[in-house]
Amino acid sequence: MEAKTLGIATPRKPVLSVSARKLKDNAADWHNLILKWDSLSDKGFTTASSIANLKVSLLSKEKVELESSSPASMEEEEKTNLDYDKGLEALCEELQAILDGLTKIQMKMEKLSSTTKGICELENYHYREESSRPPLFHTWPTAFFYEVSRRLSEAYKKELLLKHTIGAELAHTADRNLSLTYLSMWLHQPYIESNSKLQLESMLLETGHRAL
Protein backbone atom coordinates (compact mmCIF):
# COMPACT_ATOMS: atom_id res chain seq x y z
CA MET A 1 0.00 0.00 0.00
CA GLU A 2 2.85 2.33 0.90
CA ALA A 3 4.67 1.66 -2.38
CA LYS A 4 1.47 2.38 -4.31
CA THR A 5 1.05 5.69 -2.47
CA LEU A 6 4.63 6.73 -3.30
CA GLY A 7 4.02 5.93 -6.95
CA ILE A 8 0.98 8.20 -7.04
CA ALA A 9 2.61 11.02 -5.09
CA THR A 10 5.44 11.61 -7.59
CA PRO A 11 4.17 10.92 -11.11
CA ARG A 12 5.78 13.94 -12.75
CA LYS A 13 9.39 13.63 -11.75
CA PRO A 14 10.40 10.72 -14.03
CA VAL A 15 8.57 12.26 -17.00
CA LEU A 16 10.28 15.61 -16.61
CA SER A 17 13.72 14.13 -15.96
CA VAL A 18 13.48 11.98 -19.08
CA SER A 19 12.32 15.00 -21.13
CA ALA A 20 15.16 17.14 -19.83
CA ARG A 21 17.73 14.47 -20.61
CA LYS A 22 16.33 14.06 -24.12
CA LEU A 23 16.40 17.81 -24.78
CA LYS A 24 19.98 17.96 -23.57
CA ASP A 25 20.93 15.09 -25.89
CA ASN A 26 19.14 16.83 -28.75
CA ALA A 27 21.10 20.03 -28.16
CA ALA A 28 24.37 18.07 -28.37
CA ASP A 29 23.13 16.35 -31.54
CA TRP A 30 22.32 19.72 -33.10
CA HIS A 31 25.83 20.91 -32.35
CA ASN A 32 27.42 17.82 -33.88
CA LEU A 33 25.20 17.84 -36.97
CA ILE A 34 25.95 21.49 -37.71
CA LEU A 35 29.69 20.83 -37.36
CA LYS A 36 29.36 17.94 -39.83
CA TRP A 37 27.30 20.12 -42.18
CA ASP A 38 29.89 22.91 -42.13
CA SER A 39 32.74 20.47 -42.81
CA LEU A 40 30.90 18.81 -45.69
CA SER A 41 29.76 22.16 -47.09
CA ASP A 42 33.38 23.38 -47.15
CA LYS A 43 34.39 20.22 -48.99
CA GLY A 44 31.55 20.80 -51.44
CA PHE A 45 32.72 24.36 -52.07
CA THR A 46 36.17 23.06 -53.01
CA THR A 47 34.65 20.55 -55.43
CA ALA A 48 32.24 23.12 -56.89
CA SER A 49 35.16 25.53 -57.40
CA SER A 50 37.05 22.81 -59.28
CA ILE A 51 34.03 22.30 -61.55
CA ALA A 52 33.80 26.03 -62.26
CA ASN A 53 37.55 26.30 -62.92
CA LEU A 54 37.41 23.35 -65.30
CA LYS A 55 34.62 25.02 -67.24
CA VAL A 56 36.54 28.30 -67.46
CA SER A 57 39.70 26.47 -68.54
CA LEU A 58 37.86 24.68 -71.33
CA LEU A 59 36.27 27.90 -72.58
CA SER A 60 39.70 29.55 -72.73
CA LYS A 61 41.13 26.64 -74.71
CA GLU A 62 38.20 26.65 -77.11
CA LYS A 63 38.76 30.34 -77.76
CA VAL A 64 42.41 29.71 -78.65
CA GLU A 65 41.58 26.67 -80.79
CA LEU A 66 39.09 28.66 -82.86
CA GLU A 67 42.04 30.57 -84.27
CA SER A 68 43.58 27.37 -85.60
CA SER A 69 41.73 24.80 -87.73
CA SER A 70 44.59 22.49 -88.74
CA PRO A 71 44.03 18.68 -88.58
CA ALA A 72 46.55 18.39 -85.76
CA SER A 73 44.77 20.99 -83.65
CA MET A 74 41.38 19.35 -84.29
CA GLU A 75 42.74 15.99 -83.12
CA GLU A 76 44.17 17.57 -80.00
CA GLU A 77 40.86 19.32 -79.36
CA GLU A 78 39.02 15.99 -79.39
CA LYS A 79 41.49 14.55 -76.87
CA THR A 80 41.14 17.63 -74.68
CA ASN A 81 37.35 17.39 -74.75
CA LEU A 82 37.49 13.71 -73.80
CA ASP A 83 39.77 14.44 -70.84
CA TYR A 84 37.51 17.32 -69.87
CA ASP A 85 34.39 15.14 -69.94
CA LYS A 86 36.04 12.52 -67.73
CA GLY A 87 37.30 15.13 -65.27
CA LEU A 88 33.94 16.90 -65.13
CA GLU A 89 32.07 13.65 -64.61
CA ALA A 90 34.33 12.66 -61.71
CA LEU A 91 33.89 16.07 -60.05
CA CYS A 92 30.11 16.01 -60.53
CA GLU A 93 29.93 12.55 -58.95
CA GLU A 94 31.99 13.82 -56.03
CA LEU A 95 29.70 16.83 -55.59
CA GLN A 96 26.62 14.60 -55.75
CA ALA A 97 28.07 12.38 -53.01
CA ILE A 98 28.55 15.50 -50.88
CA LEU A 99 24.97 16.60 -51.54
CA ASP A 100 23.78 13.13 -50.53
CA GLY A 101 25.71 13.51 -47.28
CA LEU A 102 24.17 16.93 -46.62
CA THR A 103 20.72 15.46 -47.32
CA LYS A 104 21.26 12.77 -44.67
CA ILE A 105 22.35 15.40 -42.15
CA GLN A 106 19.28 17.53 -42.87
CA MET A 107 17.00 14.51 -42.45
CA LYS A 108 18.53 13.93 -39.00
CA MET A 109 17.87 17.60 -38.20
CA GLU A 110 14.20 17.13 -39.10
CA LYS A 111 14.07 14.09 -36.84
CA LEU A 112 15.47 16.15 -33.95
CA SER A 113 12.79 18.77 -34.54
CA SER A 114 10.10 16.08 -34.61
CA THR A 115 11.41 14.55 -31.38
CA THR A 116 11.35 17.94 -29.66
CA LYS A 117 7.77 18.47 -30.81
CA GLY A 118 6.88 15.13 -29.24
CA ILE A 119 8.37 16.26 -25.92
CA CYS A 120 6.21 19.40 -26.07
CA GLU A 121 3.10 17.32 -26.73
CA LEU A 122 3.97 15.06 -23.81
CA GLU A 123 4.30 18.08 -21.55
CA ASN A 124 0.98 19.49 -22.77
CA TYR A 125 -0.68 16.18 -21.98
CA HIS A 126 1.03 16.00 -18.61
CA TYR A 127 0.10 19.50 -17.43
CA ARG A 128 -3.18 19.76 -19.33
CA GLU A 129 -4.80 23.05 -18.26
CA GLU A 130 -2.14 24.11 -15.78
CA SER A 131 -0.63 27.45 -16.80
CA SER A 132 2.38 27.27 -14.49
CA ARG A 133 5.03 25.01 -16.00
CA PRO A 134 8.47 25.06 -14.38
CA PRO A 135 11.35 25.18 -16.91
CA LEU A 136 13.31 21.97 -17.30
CA PHE A 137 16.62 23.83 -17.11
CA HIS A 138 17.01 27.57 -16.45
CA THR A 139 14.56 29.87 -18.23
CA TRP A 140 13.43 28.32 -21.52
CA PRO A 141 9.91 26.88 -21.70
CA THR A 142 9.87 23.52 -23.43
CA ALA A 143 7.98 24.96 -26.39
CA PHE A 144 10.91 27.28 -27.14
CA PHE A 145 13.21 24.30 -27.68
CA TYR A 146 10.84 23.15 -30.41
CA GLU A 147 10.63 26.64 -31.91
CA VAL A 148 14.42 26.89 -32.17
CA SER A 149 14.69 23.35 -33.56
CA ARG A 150 11.98 24.08 -36.13
CA ARG A 151 13.69 27.28 -37.27
CA LEU A 152 17.05 25.57 -37.61
CA SER A 153 15.56 22.62 -39.48
CA GLU A 154 13.71 24.90 -41.92
CA ALA A 155 16.81 27.02 -42.54
CA TYR A 156 18.98 24.01 -43.37
CA LYS A 157 16.22 22.51 -45.51
CA LYS A 158 16.11 25.67 -47.66
CA GLU A 159 19.90 25.75 -47.82
CA LEU A 160 19.98 22.13 -48.95
CA LEU A 161 17.53 22.86 -51.79
CA LEU A 162 19.71 25.80 -52.87
CA LYS A 163 22.83 23.64 -52.89
CA HIS A 164 21.06 20.99 -54.97
CA THR A 165 20.11 23.70 -57.48
CA ILE A 166 23.69 24.99 -57.60
CA GLY A 167 25.01 21.47 -58.10
CA ALA A 168 22.59 20.87 -60.98
CA GLU A 169 23.34 24.17 -62.73
CA LEU A 170 27.07 24.62 -62.19
CA ALA A 171 28.31 22.00 -64.65
CA HIS A 172 26.09 23.42 -67.40
CA THR A 173 27.02 27.07 -66.88
CA ALA A 174 29.25 28.62 -69.52
CA ASP A 175 29.12 32.12 -67.99
CA ARG A 176 32.06 32.76 -65.66
CA ASN A 177 30.25 35.47 -63.68
CA LEU A 178 27.27 33.21 -63.11
CA SER A 179 29.60 30.44 -61.91
CA LEU A 180 31.15 32.86 -59.42
CA THR A 181 27.68 33.82 -58.22
CA TYR A 182 26.81 30.17 -57.64
CA LEU A 183 30.06 29.64 -55.72
CA SER A 184 29.40 32.71 -53.59
CA MET A 185 25.92 31.46 -52.69
CA TRP A 186 27.30 28.04 -51.79
CA LEU A 187 29.97 29.55 -49.56
CA HIS A 188 27.86 32.16 -47.75
CA GLN A 189 24.76 29.96 -47.24
CA PRO A 190 22.15 32.77 -47.39
CA TYR A 191 19.35 30.74 -45.80
CA ILE A 192 21.37 30.03 -42.68
CA GLU A 193 21.08 33.35 -40.88
CA SER A 194 23.71 34.64 -38.51
CA ASN A 195 21.36 34.22 -35.55
CA SER A 196 21.08 30.48 -36.28
CA LYS A 197 24.45 29.87 -34.63
CA LEU A 198 23.44 32.22 -31.81
CA GLN A 199 20.28 30.19 -31.23
CA LEU A 200 22.32 27.01 -31.12
CA GLU A 201 24.76 28.50 -28.61
CA SER A 202 21.83 29.71 -26.48
CA MET A 203 20.39 26.19 -26.50
CA LEU A 204 23.77 24.76 -25.44
CA LEU A 205 23.93 27.29 -22.60
CA GLU A 206 20.38 26.54 -21.49
CA THR A 207 20.99 22.78 -21.37
CA GLY A 208 24.33 23.04 -19.56
CA HIS A 209 26.65 22.13 -22.45
CA ARG A 210 28.16 25.61 -22.16
CA ALA A 211 29.07 27.27 -18.88
CA LEU A 212 26.92 30.24 -17.90
Swiss-Prot record:
Residues 73-107 form a coiled coil. It is found in: Nucleus. GO terms for molecular function: preribosome binding. One of its GO terms (biological process) is DNA repair. Its main location: nucleus. GO terms for cellular component: nucleus. InterPro entries: Cyclin-dep_Kinase_2_interact. The modification N-acetylmethionine is found at M1. Keywords: Acetylation, Cell cycle, Cell division, Coiled coil, DNA damage, DNA repair, DNA replication, Nucleus, Phosphoprotein, Ribosome biogenesis. Phosphorylated by CDC7 but not by CDK2. The keyword Chaperone does not apply. The modification Phosphoserine is found at S69, S73. Homodimer. Part of the 55LCC heterohexameric ATPase complex composed at least of AIRIM, AFG2A, AFG2B and CINP. Interacts with AIRIM. Interacts with CDK2 and CDC7. Interacts with the components of the replication complex, MCM2, MCM3, MCM4, MCM5, MCM6, MCM7 and with ORC2-containing complexes. Interacts with ATRIP. Interacts with CEP152. Associates with pre-60S ribosomal particles. Component of the DNA replication complex, which interacts with two kinases, CDK2 and CDC7, thereby providing a functional and physical link between CDK2 and CDC7 during firing of the origins of replication. Regulates ATR-mediated checkpoint signaling in response to DNA damage. Part of the 55LCC heterohexameric ATPase complex which is chromatin-associated and promotes replisome proteostasis to maintain replication fork progression and genome stability. Required for replication fork progression, sister chromatid cohesion, and chromosome stability. Belongs to the CINP family. This is Cyclin-dependent kinase 2-interacting protein. The lineage of its organism: Eukaryota, Metazoa, Chordata, Craniata, Vertebrata. The gene is Cinp.
